[in-house]
Curated annotation (Swiss-Prot):
One Pfam entry name: Vpu
Additional information: HIV-1 lineages are divided in three main groups, M (for Major), O (for Outlier), and N (for New, or Non-M, Non-O). The vast majority of strains found worldwide belong to the group M. Group O seems to be endemic to and largely confined to Cameroon and neighboring countries in West Central Africa, where these viruses represent a small minority of HIV-1 strains. The group N is represented by a limited number of isolates from Cameroonian persons. The group M is further subdivided in 9 clades or subtypes (A to D, F to H, J and K).
Keywords: AIDS, Apoptosis, Host membrane, Host-virus interaction, Inhibition of host innate immune response by virus, Inhibition of host tetherin by virus, Ion channel, Ion transport, Membrane, Phosphoprotein, Transmembrane, Transmembrane helix, Transport, Viral immunoevasion
Lineage, opening ranks: Viruses, Riboviria, Pararnavirae, Artverviricota, Revtraviricetes
Gene3D superfamilies: HIV-1 VPU cytoplasmic domain (1.10.195.10)
Cytoplasmic side: 29-79
Keyword DNA damage recorded: no
Residues bearing PTM Phosphoserine: S53, S57
Natural source organism: Simian immunodeficiency virus (isolate EK505)
InterPro entries: Vpu, Vpu_cyt_dom_sf
Assembly notes: Homopentamer. Interacts with host CD4 and BRTC; these interactions induce proteasomal degradation of CD4. Interacts with host BST2; this interaction leads to the degradation of host BST2. Interacts with host FBXW11. Interacts with host AP1M1; this interaction plays a role in the mistrafficking and subsequent degradation of host BST2. Interacts with host RANBP2; this interaction allows Vpu to down-regulate host BLM sumoylation.
Protein name: Protein Vpu
Its job: Enhances virion budding by targeting host CD4 and Tetherin/BST2 to proteasome degradation. Degradation of CD4 prevents any unwanted premature interactions between viral Env and its host receptor CD4 in the endoplasmic reticulum. Degradation of antiretroviral protein Tetherin/BST2 is important for virion budding, as BST2 tethers new viral particles to the host cell membrane. Mechanistically, Vpu bridges either CD4 or BST2 to BTRC, a substrate recognition subunit of the Skp1/Cullin/F-box protein E3 ubiquitin ligase, induces their ubiquitination and subsequent proteasomal degradation.
Gene that this polypeptide is encoded by: vpu
Chain segments carrying region Disordered: 48-79
SUPFAM superfamilies, per the entry: HIV-1 VPU cytoplasmic domain
């Protein structure tokens, strides 16, 4: 009986560790998706403003440059 209780606690501890790892991975992916959505919205807003007024105002380009990694900024079509 004591052995079953010990095995139960060990199983519970292992399950808890697995749940923590899985949720950490899910949260990391969720944050990446949210950043990509924000980048897409900023790009679209910059394109719309460029079409409407011919300029990029309100610091959207700077905010987008802060969100993008440096290797993606060097590309010609980052907006």
């Amino acid at each position: 009986m004591l052995l079953l209780i010990k095995l139960g606690f060990i199983g519970l501890a292992i399950e808890t560790l697995i749940v923590i790892v899985v949720w950490a991975i899910v949260y990391r992916i969720y944050r990446e998706v949210k950043v990509e959505e924000k980048i897409s919205q900023l790009r679209q807003r910059i394109r719309d403003r460029a079409e409407d007024s011919g300029n990029e105002s309100d610091g959207d380009a700077e905010e987008l440059a802060n969100l993008l990694p440096p290797d993606r900024i060097d590309q010609d079509n980052w907006v």
